[in-house]
Amino acid sequence: MPTHPSYTPAHGAQPLVSFIVPTYNLPVDMLRESLDSIMDLSLTQEEREIIVIDDGSINSPLAALADVIDQIIYIRQPNKGAAVARNTGLGIAKGRYIQFVDGDDRLVRSGYEHCLDTIRFQEADMVVFRSSAKEQESMGTASDRGPMSGSDYLRHNNLRSCVWGYLFRRSLLGNLRFHEGITREDEEFTPQLMLRAEQLVDTDAVSYYYRKREGPVMEADDNRAKARRLDDLLTVLDTLTERLDRLPADDRAALQRRVDQLTMDYLVNIITYTRSARHLERGLLRLRRRGLYPLPTKHYTNKYRLFATMMNNKAGRKVLLYSIPLVVR
C-alpha cells in the first residue's frame, strides 16, 4: 500500500504539542470534527503538530482534507492496528508534549485549554484530565491536584489507562512504545509511562469527548475475541509483574496496585464472559502459577477489598459468579 506523507512547512521552533490521530475507516466528517477540535485551540500552527495516521482505510480521507493539508502530517500505512499506528506517530512527533486523539473523538476546548495552561505555566510532565461520553463543555472552574509524582498518583488512585486521557512530555518516553499485536496495550503502556513523571497534575476539567464504540471494534459477542482479550490481559500482567522487581520500593508499590486491580479485572471479565465456574477455576490456576492468586486483600478501595476477600474462598466465588453478571448487565 502506498504512503502519502504531507508535511507542514518547517517553522524552526519546536511545536508545543504533537497530536497523534489514528484513523481507520471512519466517516470523513467525523475525522474532520476531530481535527477541527484541535485546530480550534489557542495554539498557533507553529505551536501544534497534527499527525494523522491512516491505518489502511479502504478509502483514503486525504482528498476530503485538502483544505487543511498544509496544517497536518498525513501518513497512510497498511492496516496493523492501533498500537502500530500510535507507534508510527511517536516516531514522527517533534513536539515537547504528546496528546493522542482517536479519529472519532474530539477535544473539549474549554477543558483542554486549562490543560495547555498547566503545561505552559507549571511545566508539568503529565496532565491527567477527565473525559465524557456526553457532548458538553467543561463547566465552572477546574480544580487541580498536584503536582505530584506519577508514582504517588498510582499509589493512591484508580488509574484510567486510556492513552487519550492525559497529555504528557515526550521526553518521558525514552524507548517505551506500545506493545503491538495485543488488544490491551493501553493497560501496559500507561502505568509504565506514568511512573516516569516527576510532576503530574490531575485536573477535573472535562477535556475530551469520546464516542461509545459498537460493532467490530468491541466484538462483544465473539467468543474468540473474548478469549483473546483475556489472553492479552494476561500478557499485560506478565509484562508488568516482570517489571516489579526492577523498581525502587515506592514505584514497586505503585505498580503492584495496578497489577492487583488488573488481576481483579481479569477475573471479573471471566465471570462476565463465561458465567462458568470451570472457566473461573482455570483462570485462577493461571494466576496462581504467576504468583497473582490468592489476591492480596489490600484496602485500595472498598470494592477491591471486598472482591479479593470473596474471590479467595469457595463460597465467595459462588456468590460472585451469580451476582457479577447481574450487576454488569
Residue ranges and their predicted role:
Residues 2-5, 26-41:
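Short, well-formed alpha-helical segments that are part of the catalytic scaffolds
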Residues 14, 93-96, 109, 124:
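Active-site acidic short loop of glycosyltransferases
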Residues 35-78:
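Acidic donor-binding segment of Leloir-type glycosyltransferases
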Residues 62, 77-93, 100:
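Glycine-rich, basic loop-to-helix element that forms the pyrophosphate-binding segment
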Residues 82-83, 102-202, 210-227:
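Donor-binding/catalytic cores of nucleotide-activated saccharide
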Residues 207-214, 220-250, 269, 273-292:
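Catalytic core of nucleotide-sugar-dependent glycosyltransferases
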